[in-house]
Structures are given as structure tokens and as C-alpha cells.
Amino acid sequence: MKVIAFDECFTTTVGELPQDIKPSSICGQFLGSHQNINIQALINSIGLKPLKKGSAYKGNVCYESGRIIPYNDFLLLAFTKLDNVGNGRMTREEFLDCLEVLWKEINKYYAYQSVAIPILGSGITRLKDVSLTKQQLLDMIIASYKLYAEKIKLPAKLYIECMRDDDFSLNKIGEYI
């Protein structure tokens, strides 16, 4: 199963405007290859409840960061909060809270299959109160998972997918925690 990070509103409009999903992002590529997906029908099918307070972006219906919608071999993640112009922004604390909810949701939906997640927060999402490298984000994701009590059960595994980057090394995992 692959985790696909959306914004808190599960936006499906792909384009270049600030509020759009960028075509080159993982989410944009997913939407490009699943053009007929009906996110609202999926939300309704699992009974996912929206937050009482709407998004900062136009008051749109939004969902708690970390909540998942299962779809075939994918886990669609409500990830980043939107600001008033539609940019993805969250604080470090909101990022950690999202991870805590994410682990619970994965535990609910993974069905003893391996799960792959990207380095969340390393795309165009902006952390409001701190600037973190991909290395630091990876360390936070790993540390958060280690603290979560109910791990994915063998033979299934959790994979964190990352691209080669000058700002990243598997040899440096754990240096920033």
C-alpha cells in the first residue's frame, strides 16, 4: 500500500495556482493516473467526519491531519493544512500530531500489507515555525513511529521512500534526534 499525501481538504484540482495540486508532486501524479476518482464517495463510504471548523482557505470542508481514506492499494492522507491563499502550511507540532494520527490510521487500514510513505513535509508543504531538512523530517518520522505502540506486523513492513539528494544520507539517520 502506498500513502499519498493530500491537503486537509483532499483537493483534486491539478494545476499551477497556489491552491492547486502541483502536477509533478506525488499527489499530482496519482491524480493524473486516477482521473475518475471520486474522493467524496470514498469519504462517505468510510464515514470520515470533517472538522467542525473549516479550512483557512475559503472555509472549505477539511479533515483532521493524519486521517486516511483507503482506495485500492493506496492510503490517501489528509496531510497539510491550507493557509488563506491555499498554500500548504503547518507547524512542527501539527506535523508531529499528524504523524501520531497517521500511525493509528495505518494500523486500522493496512490489512497486513507492507506500507510505503514518502518523506512527508519534504515537498512544497511549508513548516511555519521551523526550517527542517529532508534528513530531519525523516528522523522525526522514524522517531514518531518508534514511539507508536502498535507497529505494522511482520511479514508486512513500513517503507519510507526517499530520492537521492545532496541534503540526505541514510548514514545520517538519527543524528538530528
Feature-to-residue mapping (PLM):
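Macrodomain-like recognition of ADP-ribose-binding/processing modules
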Residues: M1-I177
